[in-house]
Curated annotation (Swiss-Prot):
Keywords of the record: Cell adhesion impairing toxin, Disulfide bond, Hemostasis impairing toxin, Platelet aggregation inhibiting toxin, Secreted, Toxin
Protein origin, superkingdom: Eukaryota
Locations listed in the record: Secreted
Assembly description: Monomer (disintegrin).
Protein name: Disintegrin lutosin
Chain's role: Inhibits fibrinogen interaction with platelets. Acts by binding to alpha-IIb/beta-3 (ITGA2B/ITGB3) on the platelet surface and inhibits aggregation induced by ADP, thrombin, platelet-activating factor and collagen.
Organism in which the protein naturally occurs: Crotalus lutosus
Lineage summary: Eukaryota, Metazoa, Chordata, Craniata, Vertebrata
Length: 73
């Protein structure tokens, strides 16, 4: 929703302040395939294994999302 940095549904999330829906100090992310322990996963880390002849999708190091690289190998 507008103004939210993270999903504040669970007070147990160590990366997200459930009262404000903002990331806790020092956190880069709260969830996502490229988020681990509140930090973006290193660029080039496989976040989605390829199917068929397509290449694996990898983290960018700048986002918690796992982009679809869409490259045919």
């Amino acid at each position: 929703e507008a103004g939210e940095e993270c999903d504040c549904g669970s007070p147990a999330n160590p990366c997200c302040d459930a009262a404000t829906c903002k990331l806790r100090p020092g956190a880069q992310c709260a969830d996502g395939l490229c988020c681990d322990q509140c930090r973006f996963i290193k660029k080039g880390t496989v976040c989605r294994v390829a199917r068929g002849d397509w290449n694996d999708d990898t983290c960018t190091g700048q986002s918690a999302d796992c982009p679809r690289n869409g490259l045919y190998g």
